[in-house]
Amino acid sequence: MKVRSVVFLGVALSLAGCGGEHPLKPAPLALTTPAVLAQVHAAADSVEAAGAGLRLGTDLWRDFMPIAPPDGEPLRAVLLITTADSSAFPPALRADAAWVLKGDEVWATWVKETRPRLPGAPTLEVYAEGGPKWGPGIEVDVVVRLRDAADRAWYLRAREQMIHRTD
């Protein structure tokens, strides 16, 4: 019995450690406070952070492939934060959260980097999954929060982004 308990505990702790700094899970209330949402709604289409001009691109989709549920999988998002002049993305910046806005509805979520950063690359790529079942075929606004080593925050917006469908 002790051996089984120890093995179970080891597996549980291993799984709990998966996902890095912000495992993809429902966003805490901290991402939806009135103060944070005011920053989200005021987000600019481009920002200057850590000496670089930055823009946001997105790839939003819902999966309707045959193995998906009949009403499709929840929304997934890849967010590409790119330097305006194609210079190296500032290494001190990280993205920690994102919001997808559909009218008065908001999906707030943690994001995580999808792959290791390449030195000199102009883009930071982050990912989120488990969103609402909006669309496909509708436009939404997307906001990402960037932070630096001093924990200063910048909010960057991409307007009218299409939610696509995969079949």
Regions from the PLM with identified roles:
Residues 14-17:
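C-terminal motif of bacterial Sec signal peptides marking the signal peptidase cleavage site
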Residues 19-22:
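Bacterial signal peptide processing site
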Residues 25-49:
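Post-signal peptide N-terminal segment of mature Sec-exported envelope proteins
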Residues 77, 82-109:
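Mid-length scaffold segments of soluble, non-membrane domains
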Residues 84-87, 104-154:
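Short, solvent-exposed, Trp/other aromatic-anchored flexible loops in extracytoplasmic proteins
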Residues 151-167:
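Short beta-strand elements
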